[in-house]
C-alpha cells in the first residue's frame, strides 16, 4: 500500500492538464506510441471538438522511481470550467494529493484558486507545477511569486516542466512520489468503496469507478449498494491503463472499475458506498454534497414521438452526470417535455449537444431562468424556477433573486472595462486587492445576470485575460417582474421570462422586434406584444401579405375598386379570427440572444 499514490490534476481552463496527463501516460508506458493520441483522456467527440475536458477520467500507471521501487500512480484528469467544478470536487474526494498546474505565461487565474481551495478544504497536499516553460513569454519566477502571494502555498521549488515538449516530466513524477502521501486504510477491515463516477454501457450495464477506502473487492464477490441495499455480483473488476484492463481484485487505496451487470440505471448512484453482502461495513462513507442546479430551462422534443426516447436519454445521462436534475413539464406551445436544471450555461449547451448527438434527438430549449424566492401575500415562501409558475403580481408580497459572490482576477490594464461591465450587470463591489500585475475583485451580483452572458462579455472586454469563479451567497429582495409575450392576444407560455424592472422596457422592445423578423408573414396582420401584468409595454406587427385586388380594374367607377378592397378587408378580418400563428423554433431561441 505504501507504493500507491492517488492524485488529481487541477488547473484553470487551458493551462495544460490534459496534455500533462498524456505525457505522464507516455512516460510510464501506459500506451504504445501507436495508440497515443493528443488528449487521450478526452474521449467524448464533444470534448475533442471544443478542446475542453467535461468528464473526469481516471488512469492507473506503474512508475519505476529512481529509488528502484515501482509505484502505482492512480490519477484523475479533471475539467477546468466553473460549470464542472463538482466533477473536480468528486475527483478530489478519491485522492490524497493534487497537482496544481499553472501556466508559466498566464499566471494564476480564478479557477486555479477555486480548485486549489477545494483541495485544501479536503486536506489534500497540493503540489504546484509550472507548465509551458518552453514558451518565450514564460516567466516562472514571477508566477511562483504569484502562487505564493495569491494562493498562499509554498512554490519556490515548484516543479517546472513543459507538457508539450516533455521537458521535466520525470521531475514531476519524482515529486509526486516524494510529496504526495500514500493512502491510509485498513486492508483487514470490512469493504468500503466510494463510487466516484458511473456510466451506462449498453452491453455491460452500469460501469462504476470506485476508490477502495478499506478492505478488498475481489472478482466474483457479492457486494451491496448501501443506499438501496441491493446486492450484486462483481462480474469484472479492473483498472484503466487508459485501456480497460481486468484484474483479480482491487485492494485498499486503489482506484478501479466494477461491472456487476446492473441493468436499472440508478442502481449505483455516484457518491454511494459499496460493501460486501456478508459481514459488510455498518456505516457508509461520507458522500458528496449534492450540487444544486443554478439555471433551469424547459427542453422539448420537436416531434412528440421522441418523448419516450428523450426520457430514457435523460435517465442515462443523469447517471453519468450527477448534477443533472429534471422533471416533466407541459407547454401549450411546445407540448410535452422536461424542465432541466443545469449548473450554468456551458453545462446547458453541453447537455443539449450530448442529447442531440449521442441519442439522435431534435430539441428546442426555452430561455433559461434561475430560482427565485417568492413571498406571497398569505405569508408563504415558494421557490419558482419557471416563469409560468409565478403567482399573479398582486399576490406577491416580495420577490427575492439569488445573489452570487463572483471573484474576478484581471490584469491591471483591463480593470476599468471589467468594473464598467460589473456595474452594468447590477453588481456591488465588496473587495479589491492588488497582487503584482493582477487585481482580484469581488462583486455581489444577481445570478441571473451572471449566467446569461457575463462570462463571454467578461472575456471580450478583457481580451480573454480576466477569469471568473462564482458561488451562491444569498437571496435578496429585488424588483422583478414577469414579461409575457402575446401573439395576436394569446400568451405564449414558452416565451415568458422574469426580468428586473429597470431592464424590462428595453428587453421587451428588443424581443418584439427580434420576433417580428422571425415570424413568417401570414395573410393577416400579426400583433406581437410584450406585457407586464395587464400593461402592454412594447408592440410590433408583422404586416399581412396582400393580393392586389384592384389590378384588374381599368378605368371605370371608383366604387368598383372600393367594393373589391372592402371585400378583401372583410376576408382578412374573418381569417384573423380563425387563423392561428405557428411560432418557428428560431423565435424561441431569439429570447436567448436578445442582448446581441
From Swiss-Prot:
InterPro entries per UniProt: EF-4, EFG_III/V, EFG_V-like, EFTu-like_2, G_TR_CS, LepA_C_sf, LepA_CTD, LepA_IV
Residue ranges annotated for the tr-type G domain, each copy included: 2-184
EC number: 3.6.5.n1
GO biological process: positive regulation of translation
PROSITE patterns membership: G_TR_1, G_TR_2
A GO CC term assigned to this protein in UniProt: plasma membrane
MF terms (GO), sorted A to Z: GTP binding; GTPase activity; guanosine tetraphosphate binding; ribosome binding; translation elongation factor activity
Location in the cell: Cell inner membrane
Principal location listed in the UniProt entry: membrane
Membrane topology: Peripheral membrane protein
UniProt: GTP binding residues: 14-19, 131-134
Catalysed reaction, written as an equation: GTP + H2O = GDP + phosphate + H(+)
Key words of the record: Cell inner membrane, Cell membrane, GTP-binding, Hydrolase, Membrane, Nucleotide-binding, Protein biosynthesis
Membrane-spanning segments: none
Classification via SUPFAM superfamilies: EF-G C-terminal domain-like, P-loop containing nucleoside triphosphate hydrolases
Entry function: Required for accurate and efficient protein synthesis under certain stress conditions. May act as a fidelity factor of the translation reaction, by catalyzing a one-codon backward translocation of tRNAs on improperly translocated ribosomes. Back-translocation proceeds from a post-translocation (POST) complex to a pre-translocation (PRE) complex, thus giving elongation factor G a second chance to translocate the tRNAs correctly. Binds to ribosomes in a GTP-dependent manner.
UniProt family annotation: Belongs to the TRAFAC class translation factor GTPase superfamily. Classic translation factor GTPase family. LepA subfamily.
HAMAP family per UniProt: LepA (MF_00071)
Name of the molecule in the record: Elongation factor 4
Species annotation: Shewanella loihica (strain ATCC BAA-1088 / PV-4)
Gene that encodes it: lepA
Amino acid at each position: 500500500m505504501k507504493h500507491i499514490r492517488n492524485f488529481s490534476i487541477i488547473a484553470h481552463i487551458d493551462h495544460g492538464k490534459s496534455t500533462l496527463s498524456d505525457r505522464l501516460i507516455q512516460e510510464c508506458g501506459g500506451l504504445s506510441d501507436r495508440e497515443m493520441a493528443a488528449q487521450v483522456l478526452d474521449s467524448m467527440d464533444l470534448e475533442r471538438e471544443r478542446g475542453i475536458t467535461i468528464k473526469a477520467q481516471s488512469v492507473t500507471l506503474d512508475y519505476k522511481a529512481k529509488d528502484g521501487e515501482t509505484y502505482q500512480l492512480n490519477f484523475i484528469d479533471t475539467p477546468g470550467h466553473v460549470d464542472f467544478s463538482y466533477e473536480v470536487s468528486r475527483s478530489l474526494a478519491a485522492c490524497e494529493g493534487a497537482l496544481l498546474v499553472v501556466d508559466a505565461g498566464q499566471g494564476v487565474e480564478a479557477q486555479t484558486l477555486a480548485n486549489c481551495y477545494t483541495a485544501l478544504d479536503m486536506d489534500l497536499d497540493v503540489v504546484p507545477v509550472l507548465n509551458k516553460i518552453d514558451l518565450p513569454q514564460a516567466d516562472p519566477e514571477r508566477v511562483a511569486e504569484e502562487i505564493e502571494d495569491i494562493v498562499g502555498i509554498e512554490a519556490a521549488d515548484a516543479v517546472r516542466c513543459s507538457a508539450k515538449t516533455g521537458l521535466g516530466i520525470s521531475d514531476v513524477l519524482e515529486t509526486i512520489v516524494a510529496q504526495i502521501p500514500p493512502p491510509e486504510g485498513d486492508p483487514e477491515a470490512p469493504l468500503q468503496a466510494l463510487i466516484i463516477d458511473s456510466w451506462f454501457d449498453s452491453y455491460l450495464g452500469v460501469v462504476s469507478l470506485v476508490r477502495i477506502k478499506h478492505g478488498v473487492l475481489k472478482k466474483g464477490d457479492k457486494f451491496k449498494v448501501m443506499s438501496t441495499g441491493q446486492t450484486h455480483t462483481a462480474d469484472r473488476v479492473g483498472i484503466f491503463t487508459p485501456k480497460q484492463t481486468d484484474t483479480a481484485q482491487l485492494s485498499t487505496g486503489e482506484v478501479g472499475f466494477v461491472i456487476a451487470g446492473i441493468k436499472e440505471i440508478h442502481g449505483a448512484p455516484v457518491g454511494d458506498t459499496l460493501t460486501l453482502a456478508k459481514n459488510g461495513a455498518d456505516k457508509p462513507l461520507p458522500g458528496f454534497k449534492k450540487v444544486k442546479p443554478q439555471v433551469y430551462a424547459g427542453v422539448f422534443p420537436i416531434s412528440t414521438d421522441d418523448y419516450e426516447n428523450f426520457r430514457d436519454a435523460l435517465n442515462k445521462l443523469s447517471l453519468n452526470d450527477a448534477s443533472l436534475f429534471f422533471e416533466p413539464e407541459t407547454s401549450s406551445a411546445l407540448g410535452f417535455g422536461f424542465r432541466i436544471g443545469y449548473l450554468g450555461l456551458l453545462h446547458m449547451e453541453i447537455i443539449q449537444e450530448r442529447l442531440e448527438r449521442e441519442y439522435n434527438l431534435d430539441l428546442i430549449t426555452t430561455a433559461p431562468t434561475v430560482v427565485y424566492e417568492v413571498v406571497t401575500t398569505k405569508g408563504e415562501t415558494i421557490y419558482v424556477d419557471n416563469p409560468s409558475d409565478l403567482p399573479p403580481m398582486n399576490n406577491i408580497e416580495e420577490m427575492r433573486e439569488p445573489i452570487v459572490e463572483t471573484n474576478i482576477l484581471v490584469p491591471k490594464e483591463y480593470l476599468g472595462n471589467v468594473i464598467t461591465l460589473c456595474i452594468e450587470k447590477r453588481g456591488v463591489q465588496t473587495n479589491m486587492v492588488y497582487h503584482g500585475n493582477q487585481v482580484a475583485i469581488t462583486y455581489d451580483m444577481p445570478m441571473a445576470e451572471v449566467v446569461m452572458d457575463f462570462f463571454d462579455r467578461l472575456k471580450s472586454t478583457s481580451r480573454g485575460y480576466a477569469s471568473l469563479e462564482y458561488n451562491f451567497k444569498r437571496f435578496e429582495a429585488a424588483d422583478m417582474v414577469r414579461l409575457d409575450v402575446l401573439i395576436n392576444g394569446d400568451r405564449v407560455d414558452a416565451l415568458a421570462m422574469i426580468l428586473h424592472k429597470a431592464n424590462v422596457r428595453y428587453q421587451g422592445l428588443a424581443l418584439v422586434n427580434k420576433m417580428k423578423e422571425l415570424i413568417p408573414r401570414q395573410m393577416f396582420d400579426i400583433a406581437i406584444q410584450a406585457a407586464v401584468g395587464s400593461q402592454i409595454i412594447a408592440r410590433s406587427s408583422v404586416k399581412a401579405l396582400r393580393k392586389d385586388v384592384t389590378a384588374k380594374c381599368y378605368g371605370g367607377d371608383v366604387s368598383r375598386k372600393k367594393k373589391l378592397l372592402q371585400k378583401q378587408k372583410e376576408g382578412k378580418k374573418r381569417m384573423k379570427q380563425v387563423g392561428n400563428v405557428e411560432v418557428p423554433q428560431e423565435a424561441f431561441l431569439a429570447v436567448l440572444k436578445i442582448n446581441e
